[in-house]
Amino acid sequence: MNWHKLLHNAWNSFLKKKKNNGEVIMPYLNSFAENYKTRLAVIERHLQRKDYNFGKWKAILIPKKDGGNRPLIIPNSISDKLVLKSISDYLSDSLCHLFNSVSSISYAYQKGKCTRDALVQLKRIHNPENILLKIDIKHFFDEIDKIILIQLLDQYQIDDYVKHLIYKGINPVIDYSNLKKK
């Protein structure tokens, strides 16, 4: 595992996303950025020693278009966000052969693909005899069986420690004390 490269790529992506969204850089982010190389080295050491621990995550509610609220569980720390992004990039690279097998029909959660690509493909294959079905499965991610997910990962050559981190990441310690509408 090249945690060094994964973490630096995650940091660059994280910082670029914050800047592109026009977000005000918050003090905690400035603090991290001032000595990011040292902070990334500390995270990397924990990952290499296989003793990285996620911190508490926070629960928040975000408004939905229909007037309701969608609960989100998000990491509090930049470190946790960078480790998760590193894992995501590692999985994308490790499982790209699976994505390639459905590349002409699947557009979700894949590097280099976006909603526009899906719409272009849809326009290309659309004819009056086809039916377009748009669905939203309520609580989809809540219904994923986490044990089955981990068992599926066992079928592929995924680093065992990464699987351990994934398990910890899908079963975080959650702080509900500040649950409020955002």
What are these regions (language model features)?
Residues 12-13, 85-89, 168:
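Short, hydrophobic/amphipathic alpha-helical patches that form generic packing surfaces
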Residues 66, 78, 91-95, 126, ...:
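Generic hydrophobic/packing signal
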